[in-house]
């Protein structure tokens, strides 16, 4: 019986340690509903949160962000397990799910809140993003240069509850961004 308790305690402790190995990444690529849906489908992504980042106003609302006056972008915070999916792989997905050459626009959505931006937590992540941008610019895949902003992660404000898991709640697989 004592051994069972030790094993249970060990497993709980191990689960806590493993959970703490998760990392977060933040991406802005147009309307956050579709971006969130894409990242949710990846193995190694544990959770996503849609929200606002890159602006001047604390705790902005969707309505305020949509005015374009706050400087925020609609963004997705991705919590992931780096032993399953790397930051580099997340950046690859980010660049494939939107057009990184359009300034402040994705599809029919126009405004600074729909800009392309990838956020980094350290110099290694910054280097990964910049290398991928350079590779895209040299690839000839686009007729215009990549305009994705590369910025440090600062304040990320969760969007309102009705925006979280938007497509999941409605039984929609995703959208063509």
Region annotations inferred by a language model:
Residues 1-6:
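Positively charged n-region of N-terminal signal peptides that target proteins for export
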């Amino acid at each position: 019986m004592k051994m069972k308790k030790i094993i249970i305690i060990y497993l709980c402790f191990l689960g806590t340690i493993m959970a703490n190995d998760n990392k977060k990444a933040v991406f802005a690529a147009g309307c956050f509903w579709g971006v969130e849906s894409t990242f949710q489908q990846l193995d190694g992504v544990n959770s996503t949160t849609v929200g606002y980042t890159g602006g001047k106003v604390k705790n902005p609302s969707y309505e305020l962000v949509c005015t374009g006056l706050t400087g925020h972008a609609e963004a997705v915070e991705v919590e992931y397990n780096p032993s399953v999916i790397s930051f580099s792989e997340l950046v690859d997905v980010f660049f494939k799910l939107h057009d990184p050459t359009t300034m402040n626009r994705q599809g029919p959505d126009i405004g600074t809140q729909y800009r392309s931006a990838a956020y980094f937590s350290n110099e290694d992540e910054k280097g990964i993003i910049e290398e991928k941008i350079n590779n895209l610019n040299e690839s000839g895949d686009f007729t215009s240069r990549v305009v994705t902003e590369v910025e440090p992660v600062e304040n990320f404000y969760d969007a309102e509850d009705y925006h979280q898991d938007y497509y999941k709640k409605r039984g929609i697989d995703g959208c063509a961004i």
